[in-house]
Swiss-Prot record:
GO biological process: diaminopimelate biosynthetic process; lysine biosynthetic process via diaminopimelate
A Gene Ontology cellular-component term: cytoplasm
UniProt name for this protein: 2,3,4,5-tetrahydropyridine-2,6-dicarboxylate N-succinyltransferase
KW Disulfide bond (keyword) present: no
Homology family: Belongs to the transferase hexapeptide repeat family.
Annotated compartments: Cytoplasm
Length: 274
């Protein structure tokens, strides 16, 4: 079934210029709808983990997400007295109290998750935003005004602090999703974008910005890397000298490895997860 879906999606992607809500083969619309539903219930995900820092990205699923926008018209959506005009309904729209309770997710108003995102049991959505294609795993808290971008992957027992932004893949178009692995703590107002991977058990301090072009400097080894924060790192914002000290440029600095003291200040509160 998956191979058949992939074949239909790949072919539709190659012919996407000819597609519209009024002019799309039935098998294409059904295939795209099937993928979005599978993303919504966690049966499919845009990327799957093979090991620490090792992920396989399923580009055909990302293509299906993009195609869904071409195949749908904007429609009126309502929430109380508020009107919206969009192509993607919210994840919990039309669900009963019992159905939402069965998901095991706590959703604090006015949090929004779009249909086609997955939020696992034990996760908490404070007033935040989870975009289509994103995956939020068990026990994770998405704190107030945090944004989980399209197709971003967030692991188990992660804390995304207030105002954190995880970049999406839809616009500007990115090849790979942003990934936060298990047991990470992302400090307030930090931004992780452009397919950067933060490996498991890492702590990103407040106000750290990491994209593919951001130098990630390890002060213990003197090494500079890009696009990946090694497992168990504690990262703060800083600067590196350039041009023989004439000026400095922004960098993310690995100041140490996570220790017991770090864990005590970034541990999750079980009382919030009862």
């Amino acid at each position: 079934m998956t191979q058949q879906l992939q074949s239909i999606i790949d072919t539709a992607w190659d012919n996407r210029a000819s597609l519209s809500p009024a002019a799309a083969p039935k098998e294409v619309t059904e295939a795209v709808d099937h993928v979005i539903e599978a993303l919504n219930n966690g049966q499919l995900r845009v990327a799957t983990r093979e090991g620490v820092g090792q992920w396989t990205v399923h580009q055909w699923i990302k293509k299906a997400v993009l195609l869904s926008f071409r195949l749908k018209d904007n429609v009126l959506m309502q929430s109380g007295d508020l009107n919206f005009f969009d192509k993607v309904p919210t994840k919990f729209a039309g669900m009963t109290e019992a159905e939402i309770a069965a998901t095991g997710v706590r959703v604090v108003p006015p949090a929004v998750a779009r249909r086609g995102s997955f939020v696992a049991k034990g996760a908490i959505l404070m007033p935040s935003y989870v975009n289509i294609g994103a995956y939020v795993d068990e026990g994770t808290m998405v704190d107030t005004w945090a944004t989980v971008g399209s197709c971003a992957q967030v692991g188990k027992n992660v804390h995304l602090s207030g105002g954190v932004g995880l970049g999406g893949v839809l616009e500007p178009l990115q090849a790979n999703p942003t990934i936060i692995e298990d047991n990470c703590f992302i400090g307030a107002r930090s931004e992780i974008v452009e397919g950067v991977i933060v490996e498991e058990n890492s702590v990103i301090s407040m106000g750290v910005y990491i994209g593919q072009s951001t130098p990630i400097y390890d002060r213990a080894t003197g090494e500079t890397s890009y696009g990946r924060v090694p497992a168990g790192s504690v990262v703060v914002s800083g600067n590196l000298p350039k041009d023989n000290g004439r000026y400095s440029m922004y960098a993310a600095i690995i100041v140490k490895k996570v220790d017991a003291k770090t864990r005590s200040t970034t541990s999750l509160n079980d009382l919030l997860r009862d």
